[in-house]
Amino acid sequence: MLAIYKKEVKSYFTTMTGYVFIAFLALVVGYVFYMINVKSSYAWIGKTLEYSYVSIVFMILVPVMTMKVFADERHTKTDQMLFTAPVTVGQIVWGKYLAILTVFLVNVLIICMYPLFMADYGEIPFLASYSAIGGFFLMGAVYFAVGLFISSITENQIISAVVTFAVILLSFMMQYMTGIVPSKPMPTAVVTAVFFVILAV
């Protein structure tokens, strides 16, 4: 697993993929942080991380990062080399997953410095801020896992990216969809059934 992890991390930083992901996400989060926390003197960084611009960029970057992790290897048939190597399927998956989380962790560590920067200008809710950052990391970990799973069941990178984007978009929309779900059991069951039928189609 360690060999796969090192290989994947190296591939992200010997190409532009890792650098573009880190730079683009850091740029957007940094801009929103400046506008909300610095310019508007808002102490809690969680407001920055839940902002729509950050969410939209995240929805785009995650599919781009995960679309070729397994799909490209299935398409080029190089996945057979992995499966014949002296490692288990679980070790392959974990190696690739931890590698992509390592790239994301660079952004999280950058964000961790923002509350410290704000501390020079007033009282900062550090516990709430770092809890929000931890939640942001866990959210990213879930979405990357979803992206890797979808990449593993298709050979087409575009399909992998589109489906991953759709799943993440749907998860973001869930909080707005709760208002249209009826409170009574039977109508709720009907709405839920229709929802899953649409997903199946």
Report the location of each language-model feature.
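Transmembrane helix boundary and interhelical loop/hinge segments in multi-pass membrane proteins
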Residues: 65-83, 97
